[in-house]
Amino acid sequence: MMQKCLSPKTLIAALVVLSACGRADHLGKAPSFTPNTESPEHVAMLWPGLPLHTQPQRSVDRASLWSGGQNSLLGDQRAMKKGDILTVVIEIDEKAEISNDTNRSRSGSESLGVPHLLGLPQRIDEKLPEGASMSNAVAVDSSSASGGKGSVKRKEKLTLRVAATVVDVLPNGVLSITGSQELRVNFELRELLVSGYVRPEDISRQNEITYDKIASARVSYGGRGQITDVQQPRYGQQVLDMVLPF
């Protein structure tokens, strides 16, 4: 069977169509939300799975008016198993300033001459061009200097709260959480994604955890829509910036 090669025009047309697919969703309308049924949170809630360790059932105290279970009034309401929900508090207020200044200089000189050596320099001087002499045969001077200066100044402030779902419980008891939030304002959709690993004992009694107690934390705050499209360079310009060496 013979394989047909695509022409350059066909390839260019295909690339143009593919580059427009990401924006076709919000062409002339507001961007669509991501379906909840496709999220890992939905899967974790739908299939909580079996516990890794089976705990023996505690006997019921008939003399007490309160139940000791998680769903009771005095029970522990914190997230602890797959499918449970907790609140992630993100309060980032960071400021960093770095300044470096480097100066380096070096100089050296070397000279070599043979004014007297058994009369040989005088014999050689007669054969050399006018002005040349063995008394100052070699002289080398060198110098180098370099300097550098750099500074970094950044400031970030972000305050958010998002509900996350326990998507997995590791064998050591650590909880793997994932949370997402979408907010659409006019023709712009803001997206907040958070994921990481937390210890059950770090979760507060209010079923909340701060971002600085999340291991391998991944926090993404961005969006998609008409404003984001205008802020980004065109795909052709991005390709040229990557390919052109000047």
From Swiss-Prot:
Residues 1-20 form the signal peptide. It is found in: Cell outer membrane; Bacterial flagellum basal body. The keyword Cell division does not apply. InterPro entries: Flag_Lring. One of its GO terms (molecular function) is cytoskeletal motor activity. The basal body constitutes a major portion of the flagellar organelle and consists of four rings (L,P,S, and M) mounted on a central rod. Assembles around the rod to form the L-ring and probably protects the motor/basal body from shearing forces during rotation. PANTHER family: FLAGELLAR L-RING PROTEIN (PTHR34933:SF1). This is Flagellar L-ring protein. It comes from Ruegeria pomeroyi (strain ATCC 700808 / DSM 15171 / DSS-3) (Silicibacter pomeroyi).
